[in-house]
Design a protein with these regions (language model features):
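A residue-level marker of the well-folded mature domains of exported/periplasmic proteins
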Residues: 3-199
Length: 199
């Protein structure tokens, strides 16, 4: 059976990996936000919607994102970060408030990636550049952005590629270490995430 065991060394390694991943994604999201604007960034307003603050990775992410935005010239007081509390209606209301406040760019980690079309329509109607992070809208939605030449982008990982990498890591370990009960098979536990969001 393949299982994860806890130890302080592994926990520290995991935390370091999460922090590095959060830093990398925050950097990519900031670059996308900066590319969407021109001129002096110090007076630009940034609205950020996070699906849920209690998610540890997203806590690291939003901290790194804010820090990186400031390092690129945005003022901290012009960056507002909202907690969607894992409720799409709450997040939609926050997005509408950001539109009313006339933010210069909106960064959204959607509660439900299936809501992307509705979110995109609202934000594009207001003429605000939009950056989706971490939870990828479907391919049809991304194709629609290209066809309409909208100022919308997605920054995140390719879930299929991540699965391929995980499989390669397991294969590299080798059967002699993975076949713990000697039956010629690799036993494993599959942990599923949110079916609404494949990332």
């Amino acid at each position: 059976m393949l299982a994860a065991c806890g130890s302080s060394a592994k926990t520290e390694t995991t935390k370091a990996a999460e922090t590095t991943a959060a830093e990398d994604k925050a950097t990519e999201a900031t670059k996308a936000a900066v590319e969407a604007m021109s001129g002096d960034l110090s007076d630009k307003k940034v609205g950020i919607c996070i699906y849920q603050f209690s998610d540890n990775f997203m806590t690291l992410f939003r901290t790194e994102l804010e820090s990186y935005l400031v390092s690129k010239g945005f003022k901290k007081e012009n960056i507002k970060i909202m907690d969607g509390a894992n409720d799409q209606a709450t997040q939609t209301n926050q997005i509408e408030n950001f539109i009313t406040d006339k933010v210069d760019v909106l960064i959204v980690n959607p509660v439900n990636s299936s809501s992307a079309a509705t979110i995109t329509d609202k934000v594009q109607a207001a003429g605000i550049p939009l950056v989706y992070i971490n939870r990828e809208p479907d391919q049809d939605e991304e194709k629609r952005w290209e066809e309409k030449n909208w100022d919308v982008t997605y920054v995140g990982c390719d879930a299929r590629q991540s699965g391929t990498f995980q499989g390669e890591i397991i294969a590299d370990i080798g059967m002699d270490k993975l076949d713990m009960n000697g039956n010629g098979k690799v036993d494993y536990i599959m942990i599923k995430g949110d079916p609404e969001n494949i990332d």
